[in-house]
């Protein structure tokens, strides 16, 4: 008790002396260094909370009182970073911060330790490390800037600092809320540091002397201004991205709001991004927040907006900030109080500039005169330039696009539509945050609404702003990403090197490693020197009596004495080693244990296995002694004892967890004889997945080093090739393939593989497959696993010996169905390993055995799945198909190698196959096996394939199969673009006779690509000239197409002869009234040119069918179109409404007819030229189609095959039918009357309005292509206004 009280008095005196005497030695005459030593010793022994108090005293002494001692005691204090106490580890982090602030050169030694503490398992330690890095990053950057000559150690140190900063940014995704909060504050400080301080930047008092980007010289030899600026902007993006995360917590969101406000005030160049982030948050509050948390977030958002509003740089964003504050329920009076005064905005730049100049004078070493000249433009100019660089954001562009569209009618419609999706009861969260809308309908409120909607659309990746930004930033992004990656890679490598130097051994690999503090050494155990045993005291002489010596011992005593003697010899290992008699001891033990029973052997074995590496000599001595005893016995000797010794050693080694040094292999290879039982132990060792490689390496060594029994060892390895464990089997196959390369082993391995392969011919798997330890009935059926057991070795050898493929074909023909299916599943990879140029594989294809057709086909598919077939393979398959096996399925794998004529001849047979097979055929022909639309290797381009399907004779193939095949083509939208389909329809229309499926294809093409409407109208008009009514099925489709494209098809219907026009009305009487209304909308001058026979049919009722003149039997001439063209000629234009330009004069009828004929000829000529220039069928006339638009899902889906031979059905709803107008003149009044109300047909597309408003020059023959292209493009906002008027 006295001593303990004395210790406490001593400790109290040291502590009190520290606080009372700042100068001079202590009361006991101790120097400061001695006091530090004493305190450190106390800290090492204390385990309670007072350890922190003692360590803080040490810190005060060596940092504040006598900094010269800092380097001396640095290692001793840093050693406490491994302390179990969390508070002690946090103290070490704080000590590192204070030490580096006192002497920045210490950062070279301490940064690696701080890096380790940043990865501590305790959350509080990590948070303390993040706080320390917030300060040390600025200190380290300032240190690097001041150093004009950078050493390798400084580079490595800065690389690790930068890497740690990147890791802390990644901690924004941590699972812990506290860590994320500290990471947010670190990112805030990083952004302020890595961005230039402007004239109007707010500078907190504590940060007046902190470094920022504007203080870094642009010509610094190591620190690159532009790289740091890019990292700062990237940190801003990370923080903004984190804040809008939908699962962000309330505390993180509150912290992020405050950080963004600080960034906006201190770095006004980011004001725009901050305001936009606040708008996004206001419109998209995280759904995970509770009601109280929502209120808290909104309150914080209001406070931060008010603080930002006070800043002079917020003048440009006052409208947005004010609107947000009003939405958050802020009174106008409070907003007015926080408005920045003009006086402040005038005064502040001057004050800040002066303060900046003062700071530059206080720190002249940061840059030289010539460096300051680079920064002459001043902070204010940089601020404006940086503000202009950013330009409009995605939200701004989308908001400007939406604002003119927010008319009262449109807003009312949006409200009505959204009413359907509203919940029946008002959510409590909405009720809590709802504030009445003030000044509704004003321009400011509309602008705010547009920004709210733009924010939602931008967050969803929609709107013109997102699209424009993507297009503008694609190329710059690619250029900017390259350099930072190289920098980051460099830093990662250097950080890894430092980490290794910290945790590695004490060997000095580089100067940097010497300076990094090493981990404390663990004390090595002191081995006590064994004392020699003293002889018993027997000083008194005794009379020798024989009876005393010859007392008999019991058997137990004898055994105990022998066992004791052996144990003493075993324990004397170290003492004998010192005396130099180790080999004698080993011989004695080996001789003794060979003569003793199993009990003694177990003791020696246990002793050996305790430290196999050190006692391996004893094991081998024992093993060879047992073998010598067997040899000495001659013919009467047995191997039992030797075998027991070897098995015990191998089994004991097998139970050892760590065998990386190959002791097992050494015992096996140096054993004089490997018995059957020992071989079984080796086999079990190989079956251990963790030791399979080592065990099989041992077997391989036995095979090569013991040739007398190499086939016995090889057989064990071959048995393992069909093992049920994948890892064991794969290792065995790997070693066997190496053995197969040896000539002396090749025949045995091959024979073994073929024997296993021949087992597949048996009706049931033989018992050899199940192993000796498994009791399985011989009559068990084949399973996939047992089949694979017979194939593993064979398939592994097949790529090395291609001749084996013929054996597989022979077995395949005799195997049962289940075996065949398994063979087909596993043959793919080995066949690919052989390659399509293998002579043996080509021979198999040429001499395909009967019954192996499926196998050969599977091989062909595996070879040609990803690469085109070789000419030699195509030749063999062609010969096989034409000469021996006329099964069209053989041609499928080599379709891309056949001639176009051969593919067309085989099409009728191919499309009658199973639907899955037909799909594979089309995938190969269209090049879409792997999701790509590339038919460059196909003998048929997509257009030729579709035309060939239309030309298939219905006698050779039923129409239902042809329709299904065409549907497969239409399902490939990436291949069958609008250009391809236009060329297909053009060529089909020019055929004679017309294909039966022509109109079905036209309707499907129009459904897929509504922009083909104008081209389809031309097709219909030319079909009239070819007397389409002579082809009943095509005529039926013609009428269907006209019915679905009304009112645009009215111009085509009016070109029909009277009799055919009457037939149209018979089948579709609903067309009569709209067509009659269309004609009556013509001017009197135009109606005068309508033939009376046509008008009679139009005006006739169902009861009166007038007699009409029979249509001419020959093909229609161009003169026959004259009456209709005259009817459609423009009449004198009525007095137009006041407009910028008068309407053009009407064109004479003769000019109109000439125009019509010129259009037809120009269109045909252009189609022919396009077809010649692009023989692959990819292109199409520019006058017909333009870029393919996005199509609704209903139109995108593949066509549904019809049940009847001809059924003209659209693939989507009828409202998707395009309403495309073909104008024949310039009369605007005619255009308006032709654009009928499209409510029955779906919304009027923009193409109609575009064509309707096109000019006379655009419709001239030479400008036909340009006019149609412009009609197919999306209409501009100016064109949208007359369209809306026409619809209304």
UniProtKB/Swiss-Prot annotation:
Compositional bias segments (type: Basic and acidic residues): 349-362, 1163-1173, 1267-1288
Residue list for modification Phosphoserine: 13, 494, 1238-1239, 1260, 1276
CC per GO annotation: bicellular tight junction; cytoskeleton; cytosol; nuclear body; nuclear stress granule; plasma membrane
Motif (Nuclear localization signal): 345-360
Record-listed cross-link Glycyl lysine isopeptide (Lys-Gly) (interchain with G-Cter in SUMO1), residues: 361, 1256
TM region(s), chain numbering: none
HEAT-type repeats, residues: 31-64, 67-101, 104-146, 153-192, 227-266
Pfam families (alphabetical): SYMPK_PTA1_N, Symplekin_C
Membrane topology: Peripheral membrane protein
One of the GO biological process terms: mRNA processing
Subcellular location field: Cytoplasm, Cytoskeleton; Cell junction, Tight junction; Cell membrane; Cell junction
Glycyl lysine isopeptide (Lys-Gly) (interchain with G-Cter in SUMO2) cross-link, renumbered residues: 361, 483
Summary of the function given for this chain in its UniProt record: Scaffold protein that functions as a component of a multimolecular complex involved in histone mRNA 3'-end processing. Specific component of the tight junction (TJ) plaque, but might not be an exclusively junctional component. May have a house-keeping rule. Is involved in pre-mRNA polyadenylation. Enhances SSU72 phosphatase activity.
Subunit structure: Found in a heat-sensitive complex at least composed of several cleavage and polyadenylation specific and cleavage stimulation factors. Interacts with CPSF2, CPSF3 and CSTF2. Interacts (via N-terminus) with HSF1; this interaction is direct and occurs upon heat shock. Interacts with SSU72.
Protein name: Symplekin
Organism: Mus musculus
């Amino acid at each position: 008790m006295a001593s303990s009280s004395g210790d406490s008095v001593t400790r109290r005196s040291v502590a009190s002396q520290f606080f009372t005497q700042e100068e001079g030695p202590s009361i006991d005459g101790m120097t400061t260094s001695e006091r530090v030593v004493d305190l450190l010793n106390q800290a090492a022994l204390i385990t309670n909370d007072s350890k922190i108090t003692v360590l803080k005293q040490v810190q005060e002494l060596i940092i504040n009182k006598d900094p010269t001692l800092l380097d001396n005691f640095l290692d001793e204090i840093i050693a406490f970073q491994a302390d179990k106490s969390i508070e002690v580890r946090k103290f070490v982090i704080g000590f590192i911060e204070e030490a580096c602030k006192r002497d920045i050169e210490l950062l070279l030694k301490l940064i690696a330790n701080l890096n380790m503490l940043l990865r501590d398992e305790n959350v509080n330690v990590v948070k303390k490390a993040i706080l320390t890095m917030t300060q040390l990053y600025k200190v380290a950057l300032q240190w690097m800037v001041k150093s004009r000559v950078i050493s390798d150690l400084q580079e490595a140190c800065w690389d690790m600092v930068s890497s740690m900063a990147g890791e802390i940014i990644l901690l924004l995704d941590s699972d812990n809320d506290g860590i994320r909060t500290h990471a947010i504050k670190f990112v805030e400080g990083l952004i302020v540091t890595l961005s230039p301080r402007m004239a109007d930047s707010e500078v907190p008092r504590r940060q007046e002397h902190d470094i920022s980007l504007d203080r870094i010289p642009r010509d610094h030899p190591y620190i690159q201004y532009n790289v740091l600026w890019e990292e700062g902007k990237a940190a801003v993006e990370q923080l903004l991205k984190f804040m809008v995360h939908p699962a962000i917590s309330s505390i993180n969101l509150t912290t992020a709001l405050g950080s963004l406000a600080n960034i906006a005030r201190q770095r006004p160049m980011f004001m725009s991004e901050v305001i936009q982030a606040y708008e996004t948050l206001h419109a998209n509050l995280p759904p995970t927040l509770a009601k109280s948390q929502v209120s808290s977030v909104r309150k914080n958002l209001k406070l931060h907006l008010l603080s930002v509003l006070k800043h002079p740089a917020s003048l440009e964003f006052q409208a947005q900030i004010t609107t947000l504050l009003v939405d958050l329920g802020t009174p106008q009076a409070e907003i007015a109080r926080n408005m920045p005064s003009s006086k402040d905005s005038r005064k502040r730049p001057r004050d800040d500039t002066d303060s900046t100049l003062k700071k530059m004078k206080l720190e002249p070493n940061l840059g030289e005169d010539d460096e300051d000249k680079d920064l002459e433009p001043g902070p204010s100019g940089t601020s404006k330039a940086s503000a202009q660089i950013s330009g409009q954001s995605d939200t701004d562009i989308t908001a400007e696009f939406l604002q003119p569209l927010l008319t009262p009618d449109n807003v009312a419609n949006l409200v009505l539509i959204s009413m359907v999706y509203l919940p029946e009861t008002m959510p409590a969260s909405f009720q809590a945050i709802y504030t009445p809308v003030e000044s509704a309908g004003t321009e400011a409120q509309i602008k705010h609404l547009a920004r709210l909607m733009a924010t939602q659309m931008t967050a969803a990746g929609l709107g013109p702003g997102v699209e424009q930004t993507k297009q503008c930033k694609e190329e710059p992004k690619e250029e900017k990403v390259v350099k930072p990656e190289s920098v980051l890679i460099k830093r990662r490598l250097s950080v890894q090197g430092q980490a290794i130097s910290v945790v590695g051994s004490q060997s000095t690999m580089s100067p940097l490693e010497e300076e990094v503090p090493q981990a404390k050494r663990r004390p090595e155990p002191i081995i006590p020197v064994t004392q020699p045993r003293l002889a018993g005291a027997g000083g008194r002489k005794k009379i020798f009596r024989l009876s005393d010596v010859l007392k008999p011992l019991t058997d137990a005593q004898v055994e105990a004495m022998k066992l004791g003697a052996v144990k003493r010899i075993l324990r004397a290992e170290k003492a004998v080693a010192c005396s130099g008699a180790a080999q004698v001891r080993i011989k004695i033990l080996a001789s003794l244990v060979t003569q003793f029973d199993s009990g003694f052997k177990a003791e020696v074995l246990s002793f050996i296995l305790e430290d196999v590496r050190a006692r391996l000599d004893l094991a081998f001595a024992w093993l060879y002694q047992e073998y010598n005893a067997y040899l000495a016995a001659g013919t009467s000797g047995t191997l039992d004892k030797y075998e027991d010794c070897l098995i015990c050693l191998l089994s004991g080694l097998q139970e050892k967890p760590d065998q990386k040094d190959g002791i097992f292999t050494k015992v096996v290879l140096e054993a004089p004889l490997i018995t059957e039982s020992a071989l079984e132990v080796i086999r079990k060792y190989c079956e251990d997945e963790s030791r399979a490689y080592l065990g099989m390496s041992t077997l391989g060594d036995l095979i090569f080093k013991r040739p007398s029994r190499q086939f016995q060892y090889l057989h064990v390895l071959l048995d393992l090739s069909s093992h049920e464990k994948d890892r064991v089997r794969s290792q065995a196959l790997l070693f066997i393939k190496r053995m197969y390369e040896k000539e002396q082993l090749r025949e045995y391995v091959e024979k073994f593989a073929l024997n296993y392969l021949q087992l597949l011919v048996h009706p049931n798997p033989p018992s050899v497959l199940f192993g000796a330890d498994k009791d399985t009935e011989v009559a068990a059926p084949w399973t996939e696993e047992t089949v694979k057991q017979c194939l593993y070795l064979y398939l592994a050898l097949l790529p090395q010996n291609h001749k084996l493929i013929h054996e597989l074909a022979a077995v395949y023909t005799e195997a049962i169905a289940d075996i065949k299916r398994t063979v087909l599943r596993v043959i793919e990879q080995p066949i690919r390993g052989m390659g399509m140029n293998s002579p043996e594989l080509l021979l198999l294809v040429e001499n395909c055995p009967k019954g192996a057709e499926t196998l050969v086909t599977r091989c062909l598919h595996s070879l040609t799945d990803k690469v085109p077939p070789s000419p030699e393979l195509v030749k063999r398959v062609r010969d096989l198909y034409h000469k021996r096996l006329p099964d069209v399925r053989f041609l499928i794998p080599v379709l891309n190698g056949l001639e176009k004529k051969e593919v067309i001849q085989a099409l009728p047979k191919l499309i009658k196959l199973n639907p899955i097979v037909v799909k594979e055929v089309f995938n190969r022909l269209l090049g879409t096996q792997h999701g790509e639309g590339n038919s460059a290797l196909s003998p048929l381009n997509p257009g030729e394939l579709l035309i060939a399907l239309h030309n298939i004779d219905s006698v050779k193939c039923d129409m239902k199969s042809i329709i299904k095949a065409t549907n497969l083509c239409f399902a490939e939208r990436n291949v069958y673009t609008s250009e391809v389909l236009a060329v297909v329809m053009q060529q089909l229309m020019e055929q004679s006779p017309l294909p039966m499926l022509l109109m079905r294809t036209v309707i499907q093409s129009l459904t897929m690509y509504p922009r083909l409407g104008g081209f389809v109208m031309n097709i219909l008009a030319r079909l009239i000239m070819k007397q389409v009514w002579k082809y009943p099925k095509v005529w039926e489709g013609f009428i269907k197409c006209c019915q679905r494209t009304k009112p645009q098809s009215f111009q085509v219907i009016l070109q029909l002869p009277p009799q055919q026009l009457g037939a149209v009305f018979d089948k579709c009487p609903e067309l009569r009234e709209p067509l009659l209304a269309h004609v009556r909308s013509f001017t009197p001058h135009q109606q005068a040119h309508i033939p009376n026979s046509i008008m009679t049919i139009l005006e006739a009722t169902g009861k009166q069918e007038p007699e009409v003149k029979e249509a001419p039997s020959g093909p229609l001439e161009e003169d026959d179109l004259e009456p209709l063209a005259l009817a459609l000629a423009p009449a004198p234009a009525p007095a137009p409404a006041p407009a910028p330009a008068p309407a053009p004069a009407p064109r004479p009828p003769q000019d109109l007819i000439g125009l019509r004929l010129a259009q037809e000829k120009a269109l045909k000529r252009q189609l022919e030229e396009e077809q010649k220039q692009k023989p692959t069928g990819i292109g199409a006339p520019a006058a017909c189609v333009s870029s393919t638009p996005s199509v609704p899902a209903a139109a995108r889906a593949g066509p549904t095959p019809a049940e009847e031979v001809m059924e003209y059905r659209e693939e989507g709803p009828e409202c998707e039918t395009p309403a495309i107008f073909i104008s024949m003149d310039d009369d605007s009044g005619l255009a308006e009357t032709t654009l009928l109300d499209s409510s029955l047909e779906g919304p009027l597309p923009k193409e109609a309005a575009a064509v309707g408003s096109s000019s006379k020059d655009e419709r001239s023959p030479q400008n036909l292509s340009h006019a149609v292209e412009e009609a197919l493009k999306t209409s501009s906002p100016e064109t949208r206004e007359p369209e809306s008027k026409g619809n209304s």
